[in-house]
């Protein structure tokens, strides 16, 4: 039988050394498992105990019952499954049935190999006792017949204890290091509050150039000149021209101010810094001014360069005023910005570009030449500009051949570039939802309605309410068609959108920046058309709340005519001075400098204008009562009537009556 390597080997040829080690090293251990056959069977009277197995019988073979295994066998000199108790070992030695004993002095175990063990059987495991006088005597007497092998497995308890202590120390050190690093980061963050948060690009790759900007040619030309200043400064300095210090982009939201800044960054080829005005000010005092200094310090190191400040009104608001009291931190930030842009040291080579839609709240010192030398207005695009913008946004979209960008541009007056991009995107979404291969005019029209009026609702069923809404909307459309000076009808629909149960669109033939008095009176009459139709058809007691928004617009237009535009008997005087509008859209800054008598006259003038328009609308509705019933029936049947079809219905009815229906001449 082969054996694994041993640390030392002993035989009974050296008995003195063996007895010493065995007597000093054995430890008390109880029997781990006892064979069932060795236990006296309990029973009633007359029960007989079972015979004990022979010393060489395997305990787990008794009556076919298995003996529980020991969990202490791993790491023993030899793997052994069967168990033998101490008494069975003594009996086996006395019977001269033991061939070999392997002793593990650390584990206090003995692996016993029997002489007559069946082939393939495993050695027996025996737990040794603390005092073994009987075993010592037996081994002395049979030292020549029993092969003894003593092994000492390594005692790793000290090593494990050392490793455990080292692990605890390592964990403590790690915790200390983590706490120190966190505190260092916290202090570093506190110190970095004063650093600028501007995004820096050595060569800005915005993906936008001047070719991607359309509809605002005047503003684009101004900024292209700034790029030329940066690329070819000698062209201007040769004749004594100076590079402008700053360019302020002014315009309504969505008109392309930020897009222009991206185009400048993409075309200039110089270092580009971009930051929002709200990123300067923090909760700590002095942080805003420190960030301004840090921003311009970096800009001077990379001059010539561009610095873009978006929404500059967040930090450049006029000092010393405000509805909520002063803000010293914001004013300190503004003072530092003024100094950096045009102070004692100057900032040669740095061009500051800023954007805002609130130029009325900016500090006057910020707007003076030397800081923002140029103020570029980015206004709503005209019809040609809208067509060019649509062409840019339609490049990556699949349009049906029936789609005409010029027609879309004519139908979208007052739309910004962002609105037009949203219209085409909504049209593409409608096309995908309807599983069409290309965008048609139906999707474009639905997209315009979606952007202007909101999401489409569920159409009303035929009822009294639907007929009443139809008369209301036809009243608007009929007044707009028959009243000279009014914008033409674009569409009349009973399909709800947003909060409106029905809608009537009017689209001017051309972009209008000026309006005549006749046009304003016609617009007031058109707004009254819905209420007048309810009064004529259903009576004064059946009018609804549907005209609430119309009446608000009527009152605003009439008041503007009286107090601001000089279109009343009060003469050419401005009775109300517009103040700065706040962010919530209110008119807290409006001042009214007139007496109570003038206020009463203003109210009478407003009432006179509205009354005249109401009488005009009533006359048109009453003179075309049958035409109105015809149009209402058509609208209920079709739910939507386009403007051209509506005008054809009116013209065909007029021809059938052989008399003109025009009024107000």
From Swiss-Prot:
Q: Which GO terms describe its biological process?
A: protein catabolic process; proteolysis
Stretches assigned to the Lumenal side: 43-159
Q: Name one GO molecular function term.
A: zinc ion binding
Question: What InterPro entries does UniProt report for this protein, alphabetically?
Answer: AAA+_ATPase, AAA_lid_3, ATPase_AAA_core, ATPase_AAA_CS, FtsH, P-loop_NTPase, Peptidase_M41, Peptidase_M41-like
Compositionally skewed regions (Low complexity) per UniProt: 53-63
- Identify which top EC class this enzyme belongs to: hydrolase
Primary role: Acts as a processive, ATP-dependent zinc metallopeptidase for both cytoplasmic and membrane proteins. Plays a role in the quality control of integral membrane proteins.
Subunit text = Homohexamer.
Name under which the protein is recorded: ATP-dependent zinc metalloprotease FtsH 1
- The source organism is Synechocystis sp. (strain ATCC 27184 / PCC 6803 / Kazusa)
